C-alpha cells in the first residue's frame, strides 16, 4: 500500500 502523512491507502 501507500502511506501519505497520517493516511494509509491500499494500492489497487
UniProtKB/Swiss-Prot annotation:
It comes from the Eukaryota. Pfam families: Periviscerokin (PF08259). The keyword Nucleus does not apply. Signal peptide: none annotated. GO terms for cellular component: extracellular region. The modification Valine amide is found at residue 12. One of its GO terms (biological process) is neuropeptide signaling pathway. Abdominal perisympathetic organs. It is found in: Secreted. The keyword ATP-binding does not apply. Keywords: Amidation, Neuropeptide, Secreted. Mediates visceral muscle contractile activity (myotropic activity). Belongs to the periviscerokinin family. This is Periviscerokinin-2.1. It comes from Eurycotis floridana (Florida woods cockroach).
Amino acid at each position: 500500500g501507500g502511506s501519505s502523512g497520517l493516511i494509509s491507502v491500499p494500492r489497487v
